[in-house]
């Protein structure tokens, strides 16, 4: 933050407290909006600013408060004008040019005094339309009005996308808002390079570059094990209302927390207290009784602005396009940031999320030959008494200290506890070809779930000079711990389901029925601990050439005690796994071809313990290992407001766990052979032309089994449900002239066909490719109010978003639907 906040004179503080504005200047006819004399004028001053887009008069006052500029303007001449958002580090003239861009307003400057004028000639500063790019974006995306970012933090420190020798997509706050992306599943469905797959037991799996992302989550850079052993596949109940952005890494993520997955990782960056007061109210209503309301407010809590707060309250209730399903979400979030000194900031936060839902899980079956039943999209084969109740509390804390201009320290911790109580039933079984009615088995389940996750991360980051060049060094350590204590039981219900004429009111059994008839289940007590130390060096070998070297040493321990039921009999199963001093290296090189283009290459090791799996002789399965290679070129234009990337990737993985066919109940595993995924990606994000924000990504993925314990599998496709071609596009265009209050958005999610191999007959169950088009139109009523209409699946494409087996797991994509939203900014 700016040190000038601590240098305000008493008179200035009084003016701020009493809102002294618009004092008349004799002979000029101009209003003095705000005069700050916090520090004497120094040529080419630089400030860190965070000023959202807002009425121009209000924005100029905020600029004066956050800098040492004395800004004079006529309020009447600014009526109806809106500023460009500022976010990041700016020199004084850069901030003025960016804020006034596109308004037709000019200014004159005399030392520390700025006089804002209307159209003029002579010495007045003429602002060309290209001056919108006169300032760089910061890492924070809120208020930037952009689909890209000036920096990512999923690695340590803050670096631009062009400086990062791996593939990272940032889903900015504007992107989340424009597309109404409120859950982690919705975000990942719109992220380039990510395939989303519905789990029959709820939640979704996420795939990147042919492999599943599992447990690789960070909160503000702190690693947690959420998702690695989570009941809801890779997703979890977390609303996007509390986050500034979501950073998605594709490729091996071992440097994030050691036991890195093959596919990638996700970093959730939460909203912070703002430097200026701002409140946003939003209401929306959509198809299938989808209602949502949100209040988001924040700002300084004391006169000097050294204490800043943020509060978000959200409630949503909705039905779904299928029978039975419903859901209610309540989210409460609070954050405080304390500037303990000009160089030290303490941040605290708390989030509470409550979900009460009637889910429709299990998906739909198919005919016994794998062909489509062509059921109505509204079909749900579950019972009306299905219930999921989830509560999640998350605590955040971090401390940032700036030692000097070059070196800084960050210490952060996160604690999260999630409890879930679930009871549900769904059918399992293929439909005989030609049947007019079915007598399909219904599986019922109860699940009591309690998971606690702890994460800690601390590092120092800085620059140093050596051999005539400036280099960067990061040294740190982190730890994560997860404790899962749950009980589940799965049993066949006495009643059957007619898939072709479903009954949603099959009697609900009591808990004793599940305990007496469980085909599988039992109590599970799981502990996972992981510790590690890491270092990353960015060495400038020459002006265009940077070598990035990283290494992490990890210690990992897992301990699971459980009772596994199979056909009414319980077996005690205890698994333990320990890995000590495991080294995960990373290497990358960047070569600046010119000011806009950088070529890069990177290598990452893959290491994932598999202590939860036992061999037939009772020993622990050895870890999954592999390597990830990436070669590409990145571009950055218009001072970072447009980013692009093209890369080739190859990932090799071996020894992943798979069921041992010698164990009838699938209770033991073997290490599989070797698999390969390779392909290429292309992505562009940001302002491609004036007033057009775009995020577009294309991914080509080819997977293959190179070696397998079953020799008949050599050479077949690995993860056949990952499409060969994947396209994600969304753009938002602001009209000009008489229609300058209107914005139009459009996009498409498209992919080629995929398939699953039947576990029964061995035949392929094919899923057709599809393209789903979405759109948006927005209108800004005035400086406070705006409305928007979003339409999803505009052409009402009928398709399966997930292909399962003959018995279950086939899910329709959402039919055409609309959401109308109204927002007010104060």
UniProtKB/Swiss-Prot annotation:
Domain TBDR plug: 160-271
InterPro entries: Plug_dom, Plug_dom_sf, Secretin/TonB_short_N, TonB-dep_rcpt-like, TonB-dep_rcpt_b-brl, TonB_rcpt_b-brl_sf, TonB_rcpt_CS, TonB_sidphr_rcpt
PROSITE patterns (alphabetical): TONB_DEPENDENT_REC_1, TONB_DEPENDENT_REC_2, TONB_DEPENDENT_REC_3
Membrane topology, from the record: Multi-pass membrane protein
UniProt-recorded Gene Ontology molecular function terms: siderophore uptake transmembrane transporter activity; signaling receptor activity
Residue ranges occupied by any TBDR beta-barrel domain in the UniProt entry: 276-826
GO annotation, cellular component aspect: cell outer membrane
UniProt-annotated location(s): Cell outer membrane
Predominant cellular place of this UniProt entry's protein: membrane
Record-linked Pfam families: Plug (PF07715), STN (PF07660), TonB_dep_Rec_b-barrel (PF00593)
Signal peptide feature range: 1-44
Coiled coil: none
Keywords: Cell outer membrane, Ion transport, Iron, Iron transport, Membrane, Receptor, Signal, TonB box, Transmembrane, Transmembrane beta strand, Transport
TonB C-terminal box (motif): residue ranges: 809-826
SUPFAM superfamilies, sorted: Porins
Chain positions of motif TonB box: 110-119
Function: Specific receptor for the siderophore ferric pyoverdine (pseudobactin) M114.
Similarity comment: Belongs to the TonB-dependent receptor family.
Protein name listed in UniProt: Ferric-pyoverdine M114 receptor PbuA
Gene that encodes it: pbuA
């Amino acid at each position: 933050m700016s040190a000038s906040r601590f240098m305000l004179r008493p008179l200035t503080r009084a003016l701020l407290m009493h809102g002294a504005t618009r004092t008349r200047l004799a002979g000029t006819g101009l209003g003095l909006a705000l005069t700050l004399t916090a520090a004497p004028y120094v040529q080419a001053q630089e400030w860190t600013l965070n000023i959202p887009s807002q009425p121009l008069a209000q924005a100029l006052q905020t600029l004066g408060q956050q800098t040492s500029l004395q800004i004079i303007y006529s309020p009447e001449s600014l009526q109806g004008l809106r500023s460009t958002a500022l976010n990041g580090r700016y020199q004084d003239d850069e901030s003025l040019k960016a804020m006034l861009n596109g308004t037709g307003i000019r200014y004159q400057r005399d030392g520390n005094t700025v006089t804002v004028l209307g159209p003029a000639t002579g010495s007045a500063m003429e602002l060309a339309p290209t001056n919108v790019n006169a300032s760089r974006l910061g890492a924070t995306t809120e208020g930037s009005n952009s689909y890209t970012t000036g920096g990512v933090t999923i690695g340590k420190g803050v670096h631009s996308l062009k400086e990062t020798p791996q593939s990272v997509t940032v889903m900015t706050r504007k992107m989340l808002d424009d597309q109404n992306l409120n859950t982690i599943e919705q975000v990942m469905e719109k992220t380039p390079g990510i395939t989303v797959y519905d789990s029959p037991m709820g939640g979704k799996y996420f795939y990147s570059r042919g492999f599943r992302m599992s447990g690789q989550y960070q909160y503000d850079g702190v690693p947690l094990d959420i998702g690695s052993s989570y009941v809801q596949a890779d997703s979890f109940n977390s609303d996007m209302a509390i986050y500034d952005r979501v950073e998605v890494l594709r490729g091996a993520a071992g440097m994030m927390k050691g036991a890195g997955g093959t596919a990638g990782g996700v970093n959730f960056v939460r909203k912070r207290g703002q430097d200026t007061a701002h409140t946003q109210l939003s209401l929306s209503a959509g198809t299938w009784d989808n209602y949502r309301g949100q209040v988001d407010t924040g700002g300084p809590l004391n006169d000097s602005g050294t204490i800043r707060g943020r509060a978000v309250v959200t409630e949503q209730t909705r039905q779904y396009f299928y029978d039975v399903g419903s859901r209610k979400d309540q989210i409460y979030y609070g954050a405080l940031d304390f500037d303990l000194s000009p160089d030290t900031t303490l941040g605290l936060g708390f989030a509470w999320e409550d979900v009460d839902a009637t889910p429709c899980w299990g998906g739909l079956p198919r005919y016994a030959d794998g062909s489509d039943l062509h059921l109505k999209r509204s079909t749900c084969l579950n019972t009306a008494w299905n219930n999921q109740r989830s509560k999640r509390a998350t605590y955040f804390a971090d401390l940032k200290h700036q030692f000097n201009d070059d070196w800084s320290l960050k210490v952060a911790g996160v604690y999260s506890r999630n409890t879930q109580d679930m009871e549900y039933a769904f059918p399992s079984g293929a439909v005989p070809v030609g049947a007019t009615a079915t007598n399909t088995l219904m599986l019922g389940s109860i699940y009591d779930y309690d998971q606690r996750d702890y994460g800690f991360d601390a590092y120092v980051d800085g620059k140093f000079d050596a051999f005539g060049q400036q280099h960067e060094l990061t040294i740190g350590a982190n730890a994560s711990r997860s404790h899962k204590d749950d009980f589940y039981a799965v049993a066949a219900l006495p009643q059957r389901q007619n898939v072709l004429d479903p009954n949603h009111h099959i009697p609900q059994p009591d808990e004793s029925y599940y305990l007496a008839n469980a085909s599988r289940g039992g109590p599970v007590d799981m502990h996972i601990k992981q510790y590690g130390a890491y270092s990353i060096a960015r060495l400038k070998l020459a002006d265009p050439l940077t070598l990035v070297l990283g290494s992490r040493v990890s210690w990992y321990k897992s301990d699971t005690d459980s009772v596994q039921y199979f056909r009414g009999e319980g077996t005690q199963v205890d698994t333990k796994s320990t890995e000590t001093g495991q080294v995960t290296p990373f290497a990358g090189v960047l070569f600046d071809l010119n000011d806009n283009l950088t070529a890069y290459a990177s290598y990452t090791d893959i290491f994932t313990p598999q202590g939860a799996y036992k061999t037939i002789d009772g020993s622990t399965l050895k870890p999954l290992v592999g390597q990830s290679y990436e070669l590409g070129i990145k571009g950055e234009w218009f001072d970072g407001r447009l980013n692009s990337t093209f890369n080739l990737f190859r990932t090799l993985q071996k020894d992943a766990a798979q069921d041992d066919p010698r164990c009838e109940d699938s209770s033991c595993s073997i290490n599989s052979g070797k698999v390969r995924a390779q392909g290429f990606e292309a992505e562009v994000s940001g302002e491609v032309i004036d007033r057009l924000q775009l995020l577009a990504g294309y991914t080509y993925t080819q997977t293959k089994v190179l070696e397998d314990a079953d020799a008949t599998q050599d050479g077949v496709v690995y993860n056949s449900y990952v499409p060969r071609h994947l396209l994600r596009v969304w753009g938002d265009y602001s009209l000009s002239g008489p229609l300058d209050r209107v914005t139009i958005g459009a996009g498409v999610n498209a992919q080629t066909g995929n398939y699953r191999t039947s576990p029964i007959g061995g035949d392929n169950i094919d899923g057709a490719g599809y393209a789903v088009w979405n759109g948006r139109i927005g209108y800004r009523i005035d400086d406070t109010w705006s409305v928007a209409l979003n339409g999803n699946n505009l052409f009402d494409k009928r398709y399966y978003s997930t292909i399962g087996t003959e018995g279950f797991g086939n899910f329709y994509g959402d039919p055409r639907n609309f959401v109308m939203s109204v927002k007010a900014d104060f």
